[in-house]
């Protein structure tokens, strides 16, 4: 992936950068192929609302119309080779996706690993060869390997390490568990029979892009994020005062009065604490209370 810059002929293009989409497939006329129609699905845009229409996630709404691409996160078609047909853009995620066709004719979308090319053959299963794009149990993957689309529970499908440029490294194996170093720096134990895909997720320069103007955020469905200190007291605890007044509290709070900006929200006795070898914020192993051991 390359990054395209612009001359500052308008204020928005001065700092704007976009992907040049050089990794995407094109036909003989230079046009990108249309997505596979059988794998498209309309999904109602939630706009940050729950089933009662109440805002549960602020600053969401609008954005360009999208069709959801059905992605195969489970990789449950085992032992059957598939050929990569196209590498496509997906408006619903930061990663690229690739269309694969199995020998029996079935087509599926999967996340496109970095450096995977059209025409490559991939496979999923415990006996799959150790090659880029193949999915296999963590217990079968050698130490030091970078993987993505990792399952947390066997058979549930990949739930972590799916964003553009993400990759987790296999660092240890102990009994029926495999330790992974996640992109956040956390080292976590996962059952060895959970599946993962070999390689790093493509589109690695996604984090280096600059939107350049507020309008591009609106295209993505992100509404303005207004600071509480510029609101009125009726709208936020930080609001009110003359000019740029301080918030008037010892610690920042949410619009509903709960502490924020550094306030710990993870339960100390959360059951999954025992699987975290090293936390992403503090070094050392977590004890039974959920705190990092000294």
UniProtKB/Swiss-Prot annotation:
GO terms for molecular function: rRNA binding; structural constituent of ribosome; transferase activity. One of the primary rRNA binding proteins. Required for association of the 30S and 50S subunits to form the 70S ribosome, for tRNA binding and peptide bond formation. It has been suggested to have peptidyltransferase activity; this is somewhat controversial. Makes several contacts with the 16S rRNA in the 70S ribosome. PANTHER family: LARGE RIBOSOMAL SUBUNIT PROTEIN UL2M, RIBOSOMAL PROTEIN L2. Part of the 50S ribosomal subunit. Forms a bridge to the 30S subunit in the 70S ribosome. Residues 10-22 have a biased composition (Polar residues). It comes from Synechococcus sp. (strain JA-3-3Ab). Residues 23-37 have a biased composition (Basic and acidic residues). This is Large ribosomal subunit protein uL2. Belongs to the universal ribosomal protein uL2 family. The lineage of its organism: Bacteria, Bacillati, Cyanobacteriota, Cyanophyceae, Synechococcales. It holds the Pfam family Ribosomal_L2. InterPro entries: NA-bd_OB-fold (IPR012340), Rib_uL2_dom2 (IPR014722), Ribosomal_uL2 (IPR002171), Ribosomal_uL2_bac/org-type (IPR005880), Ribosomal_uL2_C (IPR022669), Ribosomal_uL2_CS (IPR022671), Ribosomal_uL2_dom3 (IPR014726), Ribosomal_uL2_RNA-bd_dom (IPR022666). Disulfide bonds: none annotated. GO terms for biological process: cytoplasmic translation.
């Amino acid at each position: 992936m390359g990054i395209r810059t612009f001359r500052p002929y308008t204020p928005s293009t001065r700092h704007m950068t976009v992907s040049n989409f050089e990794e995407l497939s094109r036909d003989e006329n230079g046009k990108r192929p249309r997505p596979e129609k059988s794998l498209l699905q309309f999904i109602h845009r939630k706009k940050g609302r729950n089933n009662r229409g109440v805002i549960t996630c602020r600053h969401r709404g609008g954005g360009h119309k999208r069709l959801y691409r059905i992605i195969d996160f489970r990789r449950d078609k085992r032992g059957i080779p598939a050929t990569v047909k196209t590498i496509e853009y997906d408006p619903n995620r930061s990663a690229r996706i690739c269309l694969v066709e199995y020998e029996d004719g079935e087509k599926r979308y999967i996340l496109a690993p970095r450096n995977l090319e059209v025409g490559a053959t991939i496979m999923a299963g415990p006996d799959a060869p150790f090659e880029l794009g193949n999915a296999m149990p963590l217990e079968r993957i050698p130490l030091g390997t970078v993987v993505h689309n990792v399952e947390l529970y066997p058979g549930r499908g990949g739930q972590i390490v799916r964003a553009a440029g993400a990759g987790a490294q296999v660092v240890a194996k102990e009994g029926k568990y495999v330790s992974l170093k996640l992109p956040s720096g956390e080292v976590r134990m996962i059952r060895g029979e959970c599946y993962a895909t070999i390689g790093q997720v493509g589109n690695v320069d996604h984090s280096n892009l600059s939107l350049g103007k507020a309008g591009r955020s609106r295209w993505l469905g992100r509404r303005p994020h207004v600071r509480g200190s510029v609101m009125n007291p009726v709208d936020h605890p930080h609001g009110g005062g003359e000019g740029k007044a301080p918030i008037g509290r010892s610690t920042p709070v949410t619009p509903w009065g709960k502490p924020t900006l550094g306030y710990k929200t993870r339960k100390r006795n959360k059951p999954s604490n025992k699987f975290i070898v090293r936390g992403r914020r503090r070094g050392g192993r977590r004890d039974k209370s959920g705190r990092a051991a000294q």
